[in-house]
Structure formats: structure tokens, C-alpha cells
Amino acid sequence: MFGQQLASDVQQYLERLEKQRQQKVGVDEASAGLTLGGDALRVPFLDFATATPKRHQTVVPGVGTLHDCCEHSPLFSAVARRLLFNSLVPAQLRGRDFGGDHTAKLEFLAPELVRAVARLRFRECAPEDAVPQRNAYYSVLNTFQALHRSEAFRQLVHFVRDFAQLLKTSFRASSLAETTGPPKKRAKVDVATHGQTYGTLELFQKMILMHATYFLAAVLLGDHAEQVNTFLRLVFEIPLFSDTAVRHFRQRATVFLVPRRHGKTWFLVPLIALSLASFRGIKIGYTAHIRKATEPVFDEIDACLRGWFGSSRVDHVKGETISFSFPDGSRSTIVFASSHNTNGIRGQDFNLLFVDEANFIRPDAVQTIMGFLNQANCKIIFVSSTNTGKASTSFLYNLRGAADELLNVVTYICDDHMPRVVTHTNATACSCYILNKPVFITMDGAVRRTADLFLPDSFMQEIIGGQARETGDDRPVLTKSAGERFLLYRPSTTTNSGLMAPELYVYVDPAFTANTRASGTGIAVVGRYRDDFIIFALEHFFLRALTGSAPADIARCVVHSLAQVLALHPGAFRSVRVAVEGNSSQDSAVAIATHVHTEMHRILASAGANGPGPELLFYHCEPPGGAVLYPFFLLNKQKTPAFEYFIKKFNSGGVMASQELVSVTVRLQTDPVEYLSEQLNNLIETVSPNTDVRMYSGKRNGAADDLMVAVIMAIYLAAPTGIPPAFFPITRTS
């Protein structure tokens, strides 16, 4: 009791002395602190004030009270705040890219700027005028000083210092105080690099380190977690990272998928060992798919701790736990368990839980691990290699596209070039990636050929790390931004008829079935609008019954839609060009064209008093083995070029819908453009890995694609470089 009271009195006395020193110290002593290589926490309040309302002021220790617009300048904010922790950053991490301590020497500033600032003279203000700024300054300064004095922050600083020492020796140091030592098992081989004298981390290893450090700092420092972000930004050399990016490293789960033999487990060993030896009272969990995988990690961590600190501070139960004791009696512990012993981690209270080879652990073990997401001070780090040959051993790929950005995939091939790399047997990396290959692996065409000799596709599925596309795999081809523009931007064609071409194109994709769940007749009326295409009418027609009048019913739907378009745009078109697809039934296609011809001429004749109507033309085709042209269109090899042309125009904003779009079949409560957009969203591209042939389809999840095909083919017929014109009138019979 008396010891606790004495400690409290000493703390209060220290704070009073600190306050008296702050009031007496002068401005000259302030600059001396930084000149001698100190940090901004030694700089007292500089006697100046800013003429800004209090709500627009911000305080930067070592600088003073400024306008808060300075907070929105990342460069200024980063430079000013790095001075807060300058003396605490290990020498190995300060200015190591260029050599020397740039922060203390102010070498990051242009000489002209330094000279200009040195010539500035500020007007002194009365002491009573600067009282609010002085109080605000010391309030913020005391917060950072309390952070510096906290035991948790000291532990973090020691962790950073010791990790820098390990990094300097490429994790070969037998003691944290030494710089040399025998190489450890599977130690990374150093490669001579100009201007580089110590070990480096792979990018994914640095990200794992940042995830672990940021989360432990947030848990241990509590209220000071925000202030320590400045220190960690300086340590990890990310001064311009936004607050959103930093919060990403403090989330409570993350996943890393890394190719084989890239140093995943090798890096986790020193990270876990040093965390145990630096942070007091933490608990770490480590689990893998089998017990044989946890035993070497257990032995390596135990050997590291004993080599660094001696055997007296390390206790372990073989294969289960390792405890590291501190001089004050506190302990840090790591628990090992395999996925075959899920009860080994139940009931534990971890701060970090490493799941090694997570793609290969048992499903019931995954459920046990997920339970730790409910613990506020626990972070789960999944680290695994990939085997994309089986869905059961690549389930973590399902996290792609998650809003929290949980998944981090290390691969040498992007999604766009994956089919080409699969096709070319000598390629091992993507042409658009810079191959930063770890020095302790080999990966070339010979390795790929050898692996595939043992087992086909083993290189792509087991070694490369990316998810190889299976034959028949597909991907969407229309961009989200183009789809949103198609839905929102609809120009008026009734008021801008002068911008439209005089030709109108109609494509009919008939379906002769009464099953409304199967498919229907797609009808699209399209024209040119400047250099773009515009849709005037959309119809998705289903037959009530499959009878002999089906061609007449389909033709009547075409005529009703086309007549409304012509009525809305009087005199705008000189010709109407109709193409009726005849792949399913050529006889029915001819009947549809004949009915459309008859009905349209009757309607145009009744409106003859208003002037001559547009010329009615039909696409004519010569069937195989015949010598007579018939009014139908055979869709053969034109489909793929038509889809590719439409995708290019749609994604570049060259396809629009008229504001006065006509539809007599789509229900009133459904927007015809949205109805078409739903079908367009199902459009996928399938690439054959062996032949690199592209195929397109919209029949995904049982959805219909009739209207989409009609629109795409109508646009292709209207394209200047599309199908050669073969439109002729049907001879009228008396």
C-alpha cells in the first residue's frame, strides 16, 4: 500500500517539475533540441499565435498551433510528425534508402527553402495573448509524452529495435545483441545488390509484420493507439498512407495466399518469437493442418528464444505451449494445435492466432477458428499456399471481392493474362508484371515442364500461386460504369431527330415455344445517333400457344412496335431494314417476314395522306445448296464478331437507349432498359485454354438472352463495318 502511494506521489512531483520546466524554458533551447538530433517532444511552446478561430486550429508538437488546413496536407503532416519519434526509430530504419539520418539534418528540405525560412522574423505577441495556444500546445504535448513514458510503448519500441537487428542480419543473428552468427535452417541467401548491405523482406512478409504490429499496438496501447500510428508510419516507411489504409492493418482478420516455398512459415518463426519476447502478457495461437507441421515451428521458436535470452526464461510443454517469462514475473505464451485437435484452442484467449496452411485444415476446425472473431482483442492471420486443382483446397479464394479486402494473393500472373500463360507452356510470369522472384526459389520454363511431366497442370495449380482458369470458366465482359451510364443517360430522339441517321434496323430472333420459362422472341429496333447507336424499341414476346398462327402473332408484335416508333418520329427515317433470324425454322422466318411486309404496307398506305412512308427492306439470304434469295438471316460465324463489336461500343459509351423507347410486351411496372440490362449483366466470355477461342453467352443461371441477342445483332447490322448489306424489298403479289 505504501509503495503504491509513494509511486503516485513521485509521479505527481515529476509532472509538476515538467510543468515548471515548460514555463521557464526559452525558444533558443527549443531549436537546440532538434539540432542535437532529439525529437519534437523536447521542444517547448514557441511564443506565437495564429489568428484563426479555435475550431479551425490544430496543434503539432514541435511546431505549434496552426490552421487545421495543414492537417490536410499529407506531406507537411508526415514531415512534422515524424520529428515526434525521431530519436526512437532504430538507425537501421532511418534514411536507409539514401544513407544517413535525414530527419535530424533536415536534408529532406530544399536548401533554398531552408535559407528562406531562416530569414523569416516573426512579431512577438504579448504572453497573455498566447495563453490559449500555450495551453492547447502543452495539452497535446503531454499526451505524446505520456505515450513515451508508457510501458506498452517501450515494449513496442524494443520490438521494432530488435526486429531491425534481425533484419540487418537476415534473421541469422544468434543473439539480438550480435550482428553475426551461424545461418539458421532455410535462411534466406543474400544476393549482392548495389547500395544494399542488409536483409530485406518480401512485400507479403512486410504486410504480415504490419498487420501483427498494428493490431498488437492497438490492443496494448489502448487510448494511445491513435498517437502511435505516427511512429509506425515512420518505422514502416509509409508516411503518406491515409488513415483508411492504416485502419486496414488493424482489422481483426486477414488472409495471405502465397506460392510454395516463398518463406511463409520461415518468416512466422522470428515474428512469433520476437513478439513473445517483447510484449508482456500476450497470448499467441498457432495452428496448422497436421501435427507434423506444428512440431518444427515449435522447435524453431523454442530455439530462437533460448538462443537470444538463455534457457532460464523459457518454459515449454512438448508440442503444446511455450512460455517466456519477464523480470517482473509476467509471461507471454504461445499455444500450438493441429486442425485434428480442435479442442486444443477452444477456451483460449489469444491476441494473435496464426492459421498456417489454412486452405488444407479440416472444416470443423475452421468453425472453431471463426469463433475467435467474436473476441475484440484477437486478430486471426490466415497464411496458406494454394492448390487450385480442388475446390476444397482453395476455398479462401471465395473471399475475393469482399468489402473488407481480407484477401491478399501473391501471384506472378494477372487474371487477364492467365489464359495465355496456361496456353504457352514456357511462360511462368505475366508480361505486365515485374518479376520480383525470391532468391531461394527457382521458377522457369524448365521447372514448369518438369512439373507437368509428373502431373499435368501441377505447375499452375500447385506452384505458381494464381488461380488457373479451368476449361469453360467464364468472366463478365461489360464494365459497371458503362452499365450505369446506359441506365441513366437516355437522350430524347423526338427532339433531336436531326442527329439520327435515316436508316432504321429491326432484328427479330423468333422462338417457337409456348414455354415462357424457356425462351421468347427478342425484337430490337435500333438506329444511328451521330457516331453511336440508339435503341428505339425492345420487345420480349412469348406465344400463348404453339399453333399455326405463331408466325403471324410474332409479325404482329413486330409491326405494332415498329409502327409506334415511326409515329413518334414522323419523317425521320427513309428506310426500315428488317432481319428475321431463320436458324430455328426457315419456313417460319419467311412467313414472319411476309406478314410484316403485308401489315406494314397496309399501315403505311393508310397514312399515305401525310406523305410517302419509309422504304421497307428485308435481309435476304441464299441457303446452302440453293440459288434463290429468301427473306431471312442465318446466324453462323457472325455471332462472335457481333458480340465483340457490341462489347467494345458498349464499354466506350457508344450504345444508348432513347428516352421515348417503345415496348408493348414488357410489363408496365418494369423499365424496358432495366429489363435489358439484367440480361446484359449475364453476358460472359468463355476462353478455351487450348485454342484461345472466345465464345459469348448470356444463358447464365437459367436466364433468357433473347432480347440481348436481338439488340447485339441489330447493332451489328447497323454498323458501317458489319455484315455486307443484303437488304431488298419483297415483291408484292396481286
Swiss-Prot record:
Motif (Walker B motif) on chain: 352-357
Motif position, Walker A motif: 258-265
GO molecular function annotations of the record: DNA binding; hydrolase activity
Pfam families: DNA_pack_C, DNA_pack_N
Compartments it resides in: Host nucleus
Active site residues of this protein: E357 (for atpase activity), D509 (for nuclease activity), E581 (for nuclease activity), D706 (for nuclease activity)
Keyword field contains Hydrolase: yes
Principal cellular location given in the protein's record: host cell
Annotated motif Nuclear localization signal, positions: 183-189
InterPro entries given in the database record: DNA_pack_C (IPR003498), DNA_pack_C_sf (IPR038435), DNA_pack_N (IPR003499), HSV_TRM3 (IPR033663), P-loop_NTPase (IPR027417)
Record key words, sorted: DNA-binding, Host nucleus, Hydrolase, Viral genome packaging, Viral release from host cell
Subunit structure: Interacts with the terminase subunits TRM1 and TRM2. Interacts with portal protein.
Family listed: Belongs to the herpesviridae TRM3 protein family.
Designated name of the protein: Tripartite terminase subunit 3
Higher taxonomy: Viruses, Duplodnaviria, Heunggongvirae, Peploviricota, Herviviricetes
